């Protein structure tokens, strides 16, 4: 009696499952496992055969399709095609955007490496491609250069021999040499050679020029505005005293005439 009740309940359950499967697919009734349902073992085998197919089918929900529950977590949706992707590669549904960025970065790193150079080793001993890359410094801007490397002004003298002589001889020694100037034709042991005279004159002129340079302020005589001629000063308006004499005489005569008229 209990066995017959169990078989009846099993047959009822199988009938419900088969009815549900017939709405989706009716191949369970045609299978060999569901042909003989007289025994409990055959009934269980038929249920096991039809159960995975029923669970794999998409359920049909009544009503509007917009009100159906979501099949996946809403946080898994990531707009990977935008730049402000915040969830990262793990939470994104498709990692194509991240893969694309990594491919671009890898291509840039390959372009930085020289052709035919040694490839980085896989054991981790060699430095990565980004470690060997130099940091970007804005050297083409004024504020990109370091503070310590300032350019010093280079002093340029018009006559190199004059500067050498000024450094070689101190001021007291120069004055002693100018007081004891040797003659052009005589040397310390007697008459000098033909080239000794011009050489002595050159040294004496250099010493005199250096002494003048040390005594007074530096004047830029090699420029036009260093010492302009007197007749060119003030645009040529104020000329010499001789040229100013007729103008002064004219002013004096005018003043005298005005005073004479007022006295009358």
From Swiss-Prot:
Residues 88-204, 219-238 are annotated as: Disordered. The modification N-acetylserine is found at residue 135. GO terms for biological process: neuropeptide signaling pathway; regulation of corticosterone secretion. The modification Valine amide is found at residue 147. Keywords: Acetylation, Amidation, Cleavage on pair of basic residues, Endorphin, Glycoprotein, Hormone, Phosphoprotein, Secreted, Signal. The modification Glutamic acid 1-amide is found at residue 131. Pfam families: ACTH_domain (PF00976), NPP (PF08384), Op_neuropeptide (PF08035). The modification Phosphoserine is found at residue 165. GO terms for cellular component: extracellular space; secretory granule. Specific enzymatic cleavages at paired basic residues yield the different active peptides. Glycans are attached at residue 91. ACTH and MSH are produced by the pituitary gland. Residues 99-122, 130-142, 172-186, 219-234 have a biased composition (Basic and acidic residues). Residues 189-199 have a biased composition (Low complexity). InterPro entries: Mcrtin_ACTH_cent (IPR013531), Melanocortin_N (IPR013593), Opioid_neuropept (IPR013532), PMOC (IPR001941), POMC-derived_peptides (IPR050878). It is found in: Secreted. It comes from the Eukaryota. GO terms for molecular function: G protein-coupled receptor binding; hormone activity. Residues 1-26 form the signal peptide. The modification Phenylalanine amide is found at residue 87. Belongs to the POMC family. PANTHER family: PRO-OPIOMELANOCORTIN. This is Pro-opiomelanocortin. The lineage of its organism: Eukaryota, Metazoa, Chordata, Craniata, Vertebrata. The gene is POMC.
């Amino acid at each position: 009696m209990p066995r017959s009740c169990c078989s009846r309940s099993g047959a009822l359950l199988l009938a419900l499952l088969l009815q549900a499967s017939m709405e989706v697919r009716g191949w369970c009734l045609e299978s060999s496992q569901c042909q003989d349902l007289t025994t409990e073992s055959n009934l269980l085998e038929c249920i096991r055969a039809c159960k995975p197919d029923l669970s794999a089918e998409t359920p049909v929900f009544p009503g509007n399709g917009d009100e159906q529950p979501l099949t996946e977590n809403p946080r898994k949706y990531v707009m990977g095609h935008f730049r402000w992707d915040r969830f990262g590669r793990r939470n994104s549904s498709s990692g194509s955007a991240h893969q694309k960025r990594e491919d671009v970065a890898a291509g840039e790193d390959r372009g930085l490496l020289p052709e035919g150079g040694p490839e980085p080793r896989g054991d981790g001993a060699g430095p990565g491609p980004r470690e060997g890359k130099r940091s970007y410094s804005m050297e083409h801007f004024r504020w990109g250069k370091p503070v310590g490397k300032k350019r010093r002004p280079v002093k340029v003298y018009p006559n190199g021999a004059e500067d050498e002589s000024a450094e070689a001889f101190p001021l007291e020694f120069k004055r002693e040499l100018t007081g004891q100037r040797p003659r052009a034709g005589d040397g310390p042991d007697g008459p000098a050679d033909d080239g000794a005279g011009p050489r002595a004159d050159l040294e004496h002129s250099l010493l005199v020029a250096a002494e003048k340079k040390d005594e007074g302020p530096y004047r830029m005589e090699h420029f036009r505005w260093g010492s302009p001629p007197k007749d060119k000063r003030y645009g040529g308006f104020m000329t010499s005293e001789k040229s100013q004499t007729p103008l002064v005489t004219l002013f004096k005569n005018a003043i005298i005439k005005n005073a004479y008229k007022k006295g009358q």
